[in-house]
Regions:
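N-terminal glycine-/serine-/threonine-rich beta1-alpha1-beta2 phosphate-ribose binding loop
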Residues: 1-160
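A short glycine/serine-rich beta->alpha loop
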Residues: 3, 197-199
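Residue-level detector of anion-binding/catalytic polar loops
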Residues: 143, 170, 197
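Rossmann-fold NAD(P)-binding glycine/threonine-rich loop
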Residues: 150-166, 174-197
Length: 199
């Protein structure tokens, strides 16, 4: 299994998790997959084990509950998001939880003026510490951290990158920031020095 942590449990994360469950439930349907086997791994080999978010409607919920919580509104690719188990085609670890991460620059001020059904609602609780996040990554044996923070969350993204490095996790950045340009060569070098990958 490839154990994955999700930073930013929003629409993109919902679509990814549901998509992986769909391909796990339908192993002969590879339409939509560029490659159904990469290095011997298939979609069914991915398991989501922990999440981090700032929205009070998601924090302290299970990952399964948070993925379908407001303001997420991406179309459903499966009827129900399932936890992994002996009789289940789910790809979410049983009991996987969403923890409160730091807001930093991850919430644009103007977003707080939008209606609740289309925007963030922060203030669930104080965010957990950097070391708590590192410990959660280690305790859940996370292999890869996926960054789905909102566009422009550069400081928050670097915070999670540093936690990933300290916990020995690879990092997939799914947002357009300067993280993967010349300005970020310093960050990239930190991953290289740690023997880790950043994509």
């Amino acid at each position: 299994k490839i154990k994955v942590a999700i930073v930013g449990v929003g629409n993109c994360a919902k679509s990814l998790v549901e998509g992986i469950q769909y391909y796990k439930e339908n192993p002969n349907d590879t339409v939509g997959l560029m490659y159904d086997d990469i290095g011997g791994y298939k979609a069914a080999d991915i398991e989501f084990v922990v999440g981090f978010d700032v929205d009070r409607r998601k924090v302290n919920k299970t990952l399964v509950e948070a993925l379908r919580a407001s303001p997420n509104c991406a179309m459903d690719h499966v009827t129900e998001i399932l936890e992994n188990g002996s009789n289940s085609q789910g790809c979410v670890k049983r009991g996987a939880k969403v923890y409160s991460g730091p807001e930093m620059d991850g919430v644009a001020p103007h977003m707080l003026d939008y209606p609740a059904e289309v925007s963030f609602r922060t203030g669930a609780q104080s965010h957990i510490s950097f070391q708590d996040i590192v410990d959660l990554l280690e305790d859940n044996d996370v292999d890869v951290v996926i960054n789905y923070l909102p566009v422009g969350s550069e400081r928050a993204s670097e915070f999670y990158m540093d936690a990933s490095i300290k916990a020995g996790c690879h990092f997939v950045n799914c947002i357009p920031t300067l993280i993967s340009t010349k300005d970020s060569q310093r960050v990239e070098q930190k991953f290289i020095d740690a023997g880790l990958t950043i994509v």
